[in-house]
């Protein structure tokens, strides 16, 4: 609660410098390693501006935990207020997307009628901010960009204290199960080719399974010295923000080059062109994520319980 109040008070200071322009309300907020430009496409009172800025700061800062600083030094966030049931949802943030056209811009469509606490409990903004941890990935390998963002949306929500450990693993398990049951006839690359409308769950959660497998393998073999966080931090130092789109193999080869022992292309060769879904169940079992009637129970005496705790630990790397 103290952290929440501090963020809101800091946000109010930034909000006082907000300016009304033809594009809406424009302000800035500092996050680790970056200055975030914020455009709110509506005329709203300063208190609400302050609340929204605080939420955006907290969300972007949670992504900064991956490497210690935000992956883009000057991101632009555009907030678009919409109706209560836009996109057929009453969610506080029913839709978001990232565009890259001369700048990296995160667009978030929000329901202003919801209290600010509901925004903190919603994963959409965390998912969209997490996209900036990677270069833009070409559509034929979209499962990587959407999957890594889907993995991190749950991990980072737990690290920020917006999910409990059990909630984060419950949501991860449910997503992975949706992916496993979606289009078992397709490989991950084929699912990306089929498109979001025909293979959405496989695209989003097949890549999340790869992220989980890589993260656990890196942590286990290095006794916690390496992780998906650390290798993405190295990618950020050398290559982000990136001007051009990357293929999936190019990304995975680059990530492997940042490790003493490669892992990503091995996972790519194993799963990208093979029908079915990455085998994540044995990893969950070793982590102590026990599934009982579709409900997650966490075992602290499991072989890799400390790795599980490190993945979703508060502000942990």
List the model feature ranges, each with a label.
Residues 119, 140-209, 215, 221-222, ...:
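Acidic/His/Gly-enriched intrinsically disordered linker/tail segments
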Residues 6, 20, 240-317:
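Beta/coil-rich, acidic/histidine-enriched accessory regions frequently appended to metallopeptidases
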Residues 46-58, 115-120, 124, 139-143, ...:
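Soluble non-cytosolic domains of exported or imported proteins
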Residues 1-4:
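Positively charged n-region of N-terminal signal peptides that target proteins for export
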Residues 7-15:
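Bacterial N-terminal signal peptides
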Residues 14-23:
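Bacterial Sec-dependent signal peptides at the C-terminal "C-region" and cleavage site
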Residues 66-79, 135-142, 160-168, 225-231, ...:
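Surface-exposed patches in mature extracellular/periplasmic domains of secreted proteins
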Residues 25-141:
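Juxtacatalytic substrate-recognition/specificity segment
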């Amino acid at each position: 609660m103290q952290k929440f109040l501090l963020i809101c008070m800091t946000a109010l200071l930034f909000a006082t410098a907000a300016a009304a322009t033809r594009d809406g309300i424009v302000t800035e907020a500092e996050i680790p390693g970056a200055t975030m430009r914020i455009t709110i496409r509506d005329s709203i009172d300063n208190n609400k501006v302050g609340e929204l800025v605080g939420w955006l700061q907290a969300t972007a800062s949670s992504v900064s935990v991956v490497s210690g600083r935000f992956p883009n030094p000057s991101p632009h966030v555009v907030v678009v207020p919409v109706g209560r049931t836009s996109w057929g949802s009453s969610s506080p943030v029913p839709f978001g997307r990232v565009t890259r056209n001369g700048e990296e811009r995160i667009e978030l469509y929000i329901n202003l009628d919801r209290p600010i606490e509901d925004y903190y409990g919603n994963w959409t903004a965390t998912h969209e901010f997490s996209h900036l941890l990677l270069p833009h990935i070409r559509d034929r390998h979209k499962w990587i960009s959407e999957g890594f963002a889907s993995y991190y949306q749950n991990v980072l929500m737990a690290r920020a204290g917006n999910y409990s450990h059990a909630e984060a693993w419950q949501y991860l398990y449910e997503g992975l199960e949706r992916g496993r049951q979606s289009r078992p006839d397709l490989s991950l690359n084929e699912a990306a080719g089929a498109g979001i409308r025909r293979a959405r769950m496989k695209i989003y959660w097949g890549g999340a399974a790869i992220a989980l497998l890589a993260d656990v393998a890196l942590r286990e073999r290095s006794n916690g010295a390496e992780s998906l966080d650390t290798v993405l931090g190295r990618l950020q130092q050398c290559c982000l923000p990136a001007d051009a789109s990357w293929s999936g193999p190019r990304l995975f080869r680059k990530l492997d080059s940042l490790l003493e022992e490669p892992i990503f292309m091995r996972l790519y060769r194993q799963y990208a062109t093979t029908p079915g879904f990455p085998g994540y169940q044995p990893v969950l079992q070793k982590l102590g994520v026990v599934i009982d009637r579709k409900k997650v129970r966490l075992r602290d005496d499991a072989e890799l319980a400390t790795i599980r705790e490190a993945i979703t630990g508060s502000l942990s790397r």
